[in-house]
């Protein structure tokens, strides 16, 4: 049964377009904390698979380093792009709550099949190898489909537990994104320590089975909190938001030859009020839709267009971001990983330092730096989201420069045939800087795309944020394939040779640092001219 405003009032209190099932007790930190725990369980499951995926592909499945890295990037890119479809279905038809439940079920099925695929004997015959690979990749992409609905909706559903019109809850909403990442990083840190050890030292089947149980727990906990949630009523009594925005573009195109006088006379009073706002002075060609569209609908279309330059210029950051679970891990596998005689640190565990740095820095940022900055800027988030994103992009470039320098030193040590290999601890600084970079950019992008899209499109807004990582992974995969082909010609060693001591990851890292710097320059230019679509800029 569709919820109407009259029935909403009978069920509970409606605030900022949200339905409270229990008046004065629904939503807020009580519900948000549960959602943080729910996603912690999901992140444990996802990174229990993703963190060590390249080691499984190059190990039991026998793929080359370049092919495995390309497969990881392609899958990660798919995981990041499918939320666009999931967000569309949630915002247009299913709603976030139902989408989370359906996608969680698919997610659990995919993880279960993934664990099953590792039990199939892979070396008995060619047919058994083919069967194992088929089930493995089918289940891997079923997990991606589950992620497509789950990931954009759970974050938005958590943020929706706060009323943006209430000053205190608006600050809490900004803080929610920080603590969501804090919880996620604790979970990711745990799974990288536990799951990767089990996978490499005990059993891949058990190592992939534990994430299945974790995701089952996530769904159970989410359903447990049903009566305490606020549910969005933004779409009640309104047209499909995609249809509204599409209509604006179509009408603007149809009226492109209409005299300006006709446009000025359309909804004249409303036009004068809206054009006083700076954001309405951008993309004036869309004002031609005012003859048949409401001015609020035109502003929604403009808000979506303003996101495109920020989306494009953030992609270079995500190309850099794609290297930590692939080449950083393979790089670490060639180094001295011994802690004590007989005890080696799994290479994938090194990624834990990214999460550890986030866990350490987020409380400092949220409790010290944000209040300090807020006293000067009067911004509820301390600094604007674009400033936060830009800081993270700069740090990612710095991390890539450091990675190139360390790899140059590692290659020198390997080619000098030193009796003691270079210690893996040389990689820790680049992981730590990456972690701090993620804390700024990942949270900043979440806040930005949540706050700058029309309120009815927040699932799609979060999906746009995730799709940046998809674009980065796809472009990284494409770059690797092209560079591998070019550098492998005429009998030369590829930059990504299976023997990393003969490869040139240092050249690749320098290339990424240069691309990152160019992208950062363009980002600064677009960010400087960006006009926020709301006074509340998170």
UniProtKB/Swiss-Prot annotation:
Keywords: Membrane, Phosphoprotein, Transmembrane, Transmembrane helix, Transport. The chain crosses the membrane at residues 44-64, 74-94, 100-120, 134-154, 175-194, 204-224, 308-328, 342-362, 389-409, 424-444, 463-483, 507-527. The keyword Transmembrane applies. The modification Phosphothreonine is found at residue 99. Its main location: membrane. GO terms for molecular function: dipeptide transmembrane transporter activity; low-affinity nitrate transmembrane transporter activity; tripeptide transmembrane transporter activity. GO terms for biological process: nitrate transmembrane transport. Gene3D superfamilies: MFS general substrate transporter like domains (1.20.1250.20). It is found in: Membrane. Expressed in shoots and roots. It holds the Pfam family PTR2. Signal peptide: none annotated. It is a multi-pass membrane protein. The keyword Kinase does not apply. Belongs to the major facilitator superfamily. Proton-dependent oligopeptide transporter (POT/PTR) (TC 2.A.17) family. PANTHER family: OLIGOPEPTIDE TRANSPORTER-RELATED. This is Protein NRT1/ PTR FAMILY 5.11. The gene is NPF5.11.
